Structures are given as C-alpha cells and as structure tokens.
Amino acid sequence: LQRAGGENNAYTTNDLTNYYCQLPAQNIETAFWLESDRMLSLAFSEKSLATQRKVVCEEFKEHYINKPYGDVWHKMRTLAYTVHPYRWMTIGKELSHVENAKIDDVKNFFFKHYRPVNAILVVAGNVKLEQVKRLAAKWFGPIEMGTKYERQLPIEPVQTEARKLEVQANVPLDAFVKTWHMDARLSPGYYAADLLTEILGGGAASRLYQTLVKEKQYFSSIDCYHFGSLDAGLVAVDGKLVKGVAMETAMQAVDEEIEKLKATKIEAKELQKVVNRTESVIAFEDMSVMSRASSIALYELLGDAGMMNTEFQKYQAIGIDDIHAYANKIFDNNNSNTLLYHAQS
C-alpha cells in the first residue's frame, strides 16, 4: 500500500471495527485487493498470534496499568454495568484475557464477524459509482457471504440505587468521575443528552468549567461527555481536583451544579449556543474525505446512511422543556455511579 502512495490503519470501539485506507484515486484497486485478501484469507498461525498477543499485552500495560489514571474506566465500567458487554473495555477486562487468547478463539471471532454480509464498504473521493461497483464485485464477490450477525446483547437493567467506589492510587492529583445511564444512540433522548453534556462541560464556556475551575477553583480540569454508544451509554463528569481541595467539597459542588440544571430551565440563548456549536462540529468533521467516509459508514451501521445529511434536524428540534425533562430523568441519584480516585499521600 505504501508503494501505491497510500497508508492504512484500523481501530475498534465497543460497537464496531473500522479498517481504512487512504491512497491516490488512480491506485484505488490496490485497496480493494488488500482488504478483500484480509477478509478472504487472513493468515492465522501460532507465531503471528504470539506476536500480536505480545503487542496488545504491552499496549494494555502501557495505557491501562502503568499510566496514571489508566484504569479509571476499567473500574467505572465495572461499577456502572452489571450484564451488558460495555462493562469491559475494548482491549479486554483484564490482562489475563489477552494473555490467554487462543488461536481458535481468534478464528471463531473472525469468521463470525468479518464476513461480507456483516461488512459496510465505503469508498469516498474522486471515484465513479460504476467503477466502485465493478471493483467490489471483482474483489469481494467471490468471498462467501457468511451468516448475518444478529446483535442480541444482554439489556442492562434499570439502575435502582446509587453506586460508589473509592480507590487509592499512585497519581499526582485526586480525580472524580461520576456517570449516569442515558438513552441509546437512536433514541430521541440521545440528542437531549448530547446537548446537556455541552451545556455542562463542553469547553471553557460551560457551566462546570466556569463555576468549578475558574470561579471556585476546586478543579484544575473538568469535562462532561458521553460515548455515543449504540446501546444505552453513559453521561460522565470527569475532573482532576486542585491539590488541597477535599474530595467531599468537590463532589458536593458538582452535585450542586447538576441540581441547578434540574431545578431551573435553561435560557433560549444558552440552548442556541450549544446547538450552534454542535452544528459547527458536525460541519467541520465532514470536511475531510476520510471523516466523511467514516460518517457514512457509521450512519449506514445505524440503519440509514442518509441520516448523515438529516440528523442535525433532530438537534434543532430539541427545546428548553426537552432539556429540562431529560436532565431530571437521568440525573437521578439512583441512576448514578461515583468513582473517587484518591492520590496516595
């Protein structure tokens, strides 16, 4: 691929795996050849498995064991989820899961998921539709379709009481993480949740940053975000405390800001600001060909590639009352999970 002037990489989230190539349009067939070969006849061997196992084990140690705060989301996911697979990270719940991976496990997973019937192919750039159809038929047509994977994952039960975990770790500053369960990606509530996270923690103008970082100086940094999960995900508030600030003080301050949002409806101006910000993010994300291709693939996975051009209308339809109602729905103490990450003294 490099000799053809291109590059490739891949990533995996909790919901999908994305292999992607970038190369000159005149060499597009090289990408079809390589990706179809990967799907048709991936080379499985004990030697290659041992090599990749070692690489992933080192990645696990580097990012999740030896890195300060690296295990925060391992702990939070285990706290927040009881049955859904979101309860572990993509890389695995623990290092032993990677160390003990067997060749048959890898093969079975590959032939279950990496089949044409379960794949979405997006080609974006200076290409013609008929050219892409011809190349797809030539390179992927001969591969056995496989059996369609039906996503039937355990449904996480409604949380009925608050959960809390306190840990001591070798980190420079205390950290506070709190999550609440939110709606799935295609639910109407998803858009209200997305705007709520912007209101609370979307940058330096957000409520949490203005009050708890700039004004009260309880946190050195604080964010509010969600993961865009296909199934019901989490809204998270995540912050590092200023040295010397008591955890109880910081925790209470976050709760007070949440209660303000629940008690008093936001003004139209504040809502319009985060809607405009969301529109800008969507527009800028799709400026590059690679980002556009990834967006098309994701929306097709959601069921309709055309949503790429229409989804923003769902944000525009969210009103002040919707934000107020959704804040009161999810920011329930019984729906919360709190991780208090104490720096060892």
Residue ranges and their predicted role:
Residues L1-M39, D71-S96, N118-A124, D174-A184, ...:
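M16 family metallopeptidases and their MPP-like homologs
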Residues L1, P188-L200, L208-L212:
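Active/ligand-binding-proximal structured segments within catalytic/core domains
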Residues D322-A325:
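Mature hydrolase/peptidase catalytic cores and their serpin-fold inhibitory cores, especially
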Residues T82-V83, R87, R115-A184, E285, ...:
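An aromatic/glycine/proline-enriched structural segment found at the starts
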